Amino acid sequence: MVPAFITRLDEAVAHYCLKRCHNIRDLQRYAKRRIPRPMFDYMDGAADDEVTLNRNQSDFNRYDLLPRYLVDVGEIDPSTEIMGQHIELPIVLAPTGMSRLFNNDGEIAASAAAADAGTVYSLSTLSTYSIEEVAEVCSGPKWFQLYVFRDRDLILEFFERCRAVKYHALILTIDVPVPGNRERDLYSGMTIPPQLSLASYLDFFLHPLWSLKYVLSRQPFQLSNVAHKAPVDDRDVTTLVEYLQKQFDPTVKWDDAAWMVEQWQGPFAVKGIASVEDAVRAADIGANAVILSNHGGRQLDSAASPISLL
């Protein structure tokens, strides 16, 4: 249990800093100061030379806004509908794995914030809080992201768990046929198994609030959705990540995705689309939506940015 005074101090610091964040770059700079460097680089970094990461951002500057004036803007309604669900903002939180690396409340905090904003929260298979734990705190619409695993029974188990706690839609991620070569992680030692450098350990001491909250929580860091697949006495995150890495199937084809659509029988999106041809294939197998994505540049460098694909 984290002492109350540490929690209050951490929240006060966060509130003070967030009030001074006015754009995404401010948030990025604040995160860099607030969490240890290995965790920040894991979150902020991308594959190889990070060409795709930079392209994802810079390509937005290639496009102009063409406003139309002398129209009634007395009442603005940004709400919309996506895969049959009404949301208050045309923004959806994408799935992010291992969120407790960045904040001890991880997916619990992010999903609650999404619900407060009236939009969708997408939970990753690699989450540090489980499907059920997130459902308990997230009153808003929920989607679950997964991959095509070698163990098809594991996929069906996820389907049943999601149905039981009313996840509305599934997201199939297809752009991770092999792990990405993220050089920042190699430098810091954020690998499987971890090989943290001396500089990385020193950085933990330079971020005492983050370190204290993590240590004093006494909560094991694990991939909660698959924790039951490891021996009871060996459920650390390294064991579970190694288990999941063995589950990734490089032989996956569109027929496997079609099988998942048929088994789920509900709203289904395919994430990682990077070509018109694959978007058409996704529609052909019965997907309700496609998500243009290059995984934030984390898997394949020199890929096209999603906005340029539009």
Language-model region placement:
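Alpha/beta enzyme core
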Residues: 98, 112, 133, 137, ...
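A gly/proline- and charged-residue-enriched helix-loop-helix capping module
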Residues: 116-137, 141-155
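Glycine-rich active-site/cofactor-binding loop and its immediate structural neighborhood
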Residues: 87-126
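Domain-wide signal for the mature, well-folded portions of proteins, strongly enriched
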Residues: 23-27, 93, 267-268, 286
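Hydrophobic faces of well-ordered beta-strands that scaffold small-molecule active sites
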Residues: 91-94, 119-123, 142-146, 170, ...
